[in-house]
């Protein structure tokens, strides 16, 4: 089912504020060299749950940063509620997921440029076919 305009507006608002909060919390905790971005926020139709997809670079820090975010979920929700108190009546519950789509794209790009290029090595196509 397609998202309504209200869901899209709330998702965009939450995405912008979440990115700001997460970047500030990383900076305040003294962690440097880690880049965090919120790539997408999807809100359920009843506006009670917001799923935030977070990209973390370098990817070796993904698990520990997501764990840290989930441990501090209540503080993040409180900060979000303070920022959006004039736009939202009720703050949705937040759930965070790792967005690994950029890693997936990077893997495809590396395989095309590397030894697994089907244009340069047409024998690979026969090996990839399912029997």
Curated annotation (Swiss-Prot):
GO terms for molecular function: ribosomal small subunit binding. SUPFAM superfamilies: Ribosome-binding factor A, RbfA. It is found in: Cytoplasm. Keywords: Cytoplasm, Ribosome biogenesis. Pfam families: RBFA. GO terms for biological process: maturation of SSU-rRNA. The keyword Cytoplasm applies. One of its GO terms (cellular component) is cytosol. Signal peptide: none annotated. The keyword Cytoplasm applies. Belongs to the RbfA family. PANTHER family: RIBOSOME-BINDING FACTOR A, CHLOROPLASTIC-RELATED (PTHR33515:SF1). One of several proteins that assist in the late maturation steps of the functional core of the 30S ribosomal subunit. Associates with free 30S ribosomal subunits (but not with 30S subunits that are part of 70S ribosomes or polysomes). Required for efficient processing of 16S rRNA. May interact with the 5'-terminal helix region of 16S rRNA. Monomer. Binds 30S ribosomal subunits, but not 50S ribosomal subunits or 70S ribosomes. This is Ribosome-binding factor A.
């Amino acid at each position: 089912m397609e998202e309504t305009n209200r869901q899209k507006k709330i998702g965009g608002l939450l995405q912008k504020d979440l990115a700001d909060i997460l970047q500030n919390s990383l900076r305040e905790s003294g962690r440097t060299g880690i880049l965090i971005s919120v790539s997408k926020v999807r809100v359920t139709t009843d506006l009670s749950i917001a799923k935030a997809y977070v990209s973390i670079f370098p990817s070796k820090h993904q698990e520990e940063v997501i764990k840290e975010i989930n441990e501090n979920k209540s503080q993040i929700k409180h900060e979000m509620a303070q920022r959006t108190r004039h736009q939202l009546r009720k703050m949705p519950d937040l759930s965070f997921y790792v967005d690994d789509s950029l890693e997936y794209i990077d893997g495809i790009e590396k395989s095309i440029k590397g030894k697994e290029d089907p244009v340069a090595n047409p024998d690979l196509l026969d090996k990839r076919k399912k029997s």
